[in-house]
Amino acid sequence: MDKENSKQTAQPPVVDPARLKQLNLAIETLEKQFGKGSIMRLGDDSAVMHVKAISTGSMALDYALGVGGFPRGRVTEIYGPESSGKTTLALHAIAEAQKEGGIAALVDAEHAFDPTYARKLGVDINSLLVSQPESGEQALSIVETLVRSGAVDIVVVDSVAALVPQAELEGEMGDSVVGLQARLMSQALRKLTGAISKSSSVCIFINQLRDKIGVMYGSPETTTGGKALKFYSSVRLDIRRIAQIKDGEEVVGNRTKVKVVKNKVAPPFKIAEFDILYGEGISVLGELIDLAVEFGIIKKAGAWFSYGSEKLGQGRENVKRLLKEDETVRNTIRQQVRDTLTGTPTE
């Protein structure tokens, strides 16, 4: 018993003062050579322990990521099949960053940016920095310059598959270009990751899927650009359409599932589902209703929805219209959902 108590009350070992002096001298030398903050104790106030983030525009996905959105100072990869919502999700993140007063940049390697659609998602296109580079080297050089400036909060590259190496552009159609893009990405990410970490920028790479030839077991799907992006990404999101949303016979959107397949800032493998409506983006009200029903904040009996003693309406679309008009009820429900997601006790 005495031994157990002594173990519990044992003090950390005292470091030899001579060794401590030598360590402090070494730290001073490193800070003179490489700048203050090049090495620090994690217990110091100056050491950043909390990961800051920019919201994804989806409450469910913010929660699934564990830190409230896309982590700052990290590389994020969003990949999935065509028309699954990759660019839509990235544009929502840009809009959220701008709402907080941040500066956003889009490197449009696909040359397919639609300003009208971006505006509908809430993006301030007047302040958005857009570049449409001619080659992969130019695109990644632009990203590096923006990140190193320390003034940009979020940079989106759309997409990795469209980053064409200069050598491929200068060659003839049909020339063998095996491994050029993978080498380009590997070299660029080695330089970028440190700069992104120091600048606290969110850097999102949108990627496409390809099928590997001759795969007998396991998934034949792979992403473009080699393996470097998989390694350097702190977060990887797999986004898929799982169902169509119809208004009568007309398809008006898609039910979307996002799986966090890699996460170095929180536990991975969490899943978020939400609606993406054509011309509108993520259905914020639809997601709010789904989460509120899941958490028992809104009660559903048949087609009827009720909140407390108040009936909200019959059918999900009618409830969405009511919440759109009634700001007080909407904000109250949203706060309760947020409190449930974060584990904050509701008063």
Swiss-Prot record:
CDD domains: RecA (cd00983)
One MF term in the entry's GO annotations: ATP-dependent DNA damage sensor activity
Highest taxon above the source species: Bacteria
Gene3D superfamilies listed in its UniProt record: P-loop containing nucleotide triphosphate hydrolases
GO-annotated cellular components: cytosol
Broad class of the protein's primary localization: cytoplasm
Keyword check for Ligase: no
Protein residues bound to ATP: 80-87
HAMAP family: RecA
Entry protein name: Protein RecA
Organism taxonomic ancestry: Bacteria, Pseudomonadati, Chlorobiota, Chlorobiia, Chlorobiales
